[in-house]
From Swiss-Prot:
<dbReference type="Pfam" id="PF02245">
    <property type="entry name" value="Pur_DNA_glyco"/>
</dbReference>
<keyword id="KW-0378">Hydrolase</keyword>
<dbReference type="InterPro" id="IPR011034">
    <property type="entry name" value="Formyl_transferase-like_C_sf"/>
</dbReference>
<keyword id="KW-0234">DNA repair</keyword>
<comment type="similarity">
    <text>Belongs to the DNA glycosylase MPG family.</text>
</comment>
<protein>
    <recommendedName>
        <fullName>Putative 3-methyladenine DNA glycosylase</fullName>
        <ecNumber>3.2.2.-</ecNumber>
    </recommendedName>
</protein>
<dbReference type="InterPro" id="IPR036995">
    <property type="entry name" value="MPG_sf"/>
</dbReference>
<dbReference type="GO" id="GO:0003905">
    <property type="term" value="F:alkylbase DNA N-glycosylase activity"/>
</dbReference>
<dbReference type="InterPro" id="IPR003180">
    <property type="entry name" value="MPG"/>
</dbReference>
<dbReference type="GO" id="GO:0006284">
    <property type="term" value="P:base-excision repair"/>
</dbReference>
<dbReference type="GO" id="GO:0003677">
    <property type="term" value="F:DNA binding"/>
</dbReference>
<keyword id="KW-0227">DNA damage</keyword>
Amino acid sequence: MKLTQDLTSDGPDPPVLGKPLTRAFFGRSVHDVAPDLIGATLLVDGVGGIIVEVEAYHHTEPAAHSHRGPTPRNMVMFGPPGFAYVYRSYGIHWCVNFVCEMDGSAAAVLIRALQPTHGIPAMRRRRGLHEERLLCSGPGRLCQALGISIAHNALPLDAPPIAVFRRTEKADVVAGVRIGITKAADLPWRYGLKGSKFLSKPFRSAGY
């Protein structure tokens, strides 16, 4: 499957060709995991798509939830890699992160956007709209489309209902500053698939 090809929601879902990612994949530096996730496939109960945009966060910088230390809300970030960290943003939208690095490192990758490939009818029902480009183009949108909530917090990424599959072809990854933050706003820790129409926001340096 070409990462930038247009897909239709008619007919059966395409097969997932990549191998499931193990917890060892997420045990690496968050700055290696984040770009390597571009082109991977995220499914929750069989609904999801290709990851096209992410952001990296680490406890050493003030934009991270873990910067001030562990709390009941962010405790999952301080645990072992390969687990989901789910929180509510502005009291409205759920956001899903993948915990990375060694136990106690408090690093995670925020999943910002997907290219829908699986369970698109279910996504449309949950989102209340038809346009595929808008179904998962943002962290809150994709959580609504995939049915992700606090019930998924602290769940492993390598066991049902969550599955993450390795990309099967090289991805053309671009980088830029993160979105919607005021601290450490100059760090180029946002990564995306160049040319994707499913991004939450274009990359200024990407020329499109």
